Amino acid sequence: MDQSPGSSPVSGTRREAWLTLRGATVGALIVTVALGVISDLLFLAALQFRPDWFSDPALLVAGGPASADLLHWAALTDLFSYYLPTTVVALALWEALRSRSPMLALGALLGALGYVMAGSIGAASLAMVGPALIREYAQPGAAQAAIATAFGLLTDVVFRAVWQLVDGIFIAVWMIGIGLLMRTDQPAFARFARALGVLFLIATMFNVLGFGTARDAVLGVVFVAWIVWDLWLAMLVWGRRSPFGDLTRSAPQRSS
């Protein structure tokens, strides 16, 4: 095997594995931010930028074919931004942090995976069922009352029960767990992660109590803070800042 001076098969393998994992993690975070913003804008467009529809998404049933198309793509981009890429990030964080506290790292990972699974089901359901109900509602002679009831049930389940209750708890567990695991080497980021986790719990509490305005206000803060968290983490991973400098310590090795 040809080798450059000072290199070894082991170091080459580790370098390759690190670049792959590091690139995948940073790429997933960038997709979350970029595609997530697009998803949010599509949701706002589907809701026709109406504050009353934003507060009560069930009213979207009267949006017509244009809103149906926008809702379809908004939910799909939501699936491929906020949910599926999070799996990559969660596994990378677990790999980097599990040696510190295996049980805490596992709990944080399970919180992240629970968030991904529940939220993905909600996004997929909204993408496939919601637009069909909106189009059916717009048809002449449609049973609009029954369709509106079905659409209202769908939005209550997806928005209030899954995204703003179950997901809020799961992602809070992940954020707080990561904040505890990173409190020694990245104290500022760790505090920010724990604070973001608490904000998720506060929004969840307001949702359960029916305080819609307070819930939406907190979620607005969460939206901005989450972007900051993603970009901050991407810089830490890409810059190989502790604890991400030795993510490849368990990478498979080969003998020459």
Regions found by a protein language model. Name each.
Residues 2-255:
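Hydrophobic, aromatic-enriched alpha-helical segments typical of multi-pass transmembrane helices
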